[in-house]
Amino acid sequence: ACAPIGQRQESGDYRESWQPATFTPDVLEQAQHIARTAVEGLVAKAQASGEKGWGVFGVELFVLTDGNVLFNEVSPRPHDTGMVTMASQRLSEFALHARAILGLPITQEHVALSIPEGTVAASHAIVVQGDGEAEFRNVAAALAEPGTDLRVFAKPEVHGHRRMAVA
């Protein structure tokens, strides 16, 4: 399993995530138990119907202020929250998913954090609003900032609110 990822949403949409997220040992234990139970159940169901059930499973949980953990959803694929793994881990969720569906081994080294100890990696969705052709400005200025990475999704048009990139 990967180190915990925290996230923030606005109006139910992903805005930013960070890894590693810090939780108390009790919260982490609850979260791991819920995630393991959900994924093992889905894999067992897939295998019972002749499927393999391989791949990355993004398990989204809510941690309440009282320390209780609630299940929200499972995505049987890379999840937007996990985009931070492109900056934080030895292998990103995308590379891990490819290895898993190809039946290649995944070790602790593959999911190990690649950032200096005591630091946190973060990603932030770049969301635009409007209608029409996509236009990107100030990319050079953004990339001139040390430690900044930008992933543009190459969506040709904007319709309403749309995630166009992640930094």
What does each of the following model-derived ranges do?
Residues 116, 125-158:
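Glycine-rich active-site loop/lid that clamps phosphate-bearing ligands
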Residues 122-124, 164-167:
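Short cationic amphipathic helices and targeting signals
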Residues 1-7, 16, 59-60, 69-75, ...:
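Beta-strand scaffold of nucleotide-dependent catalytic cores
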Residues 24, 28:
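Glycine-rich phosphate/diphosphate-binding loop of Rossmann-like nucleotide-binding domains
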Residues 7-8, 62-63, 114-117, 157-159:
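A short beta-turn/loop motif at secondary-structure boundaries
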Residues 29-59, 65, 75-132:
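Active-site "cap" helix and flanking loop/linker of ATP-utilizing ligase/carboxylase catalytic domains
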Residues 1-23, 161-166:
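Glycine-rich phosphate-binding loop of ATP-grasp-fold ATP-dependent ligases
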Residues 64-70, 161-162:
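A short, glycine/Asx- and small/polar-enriched loop/turn
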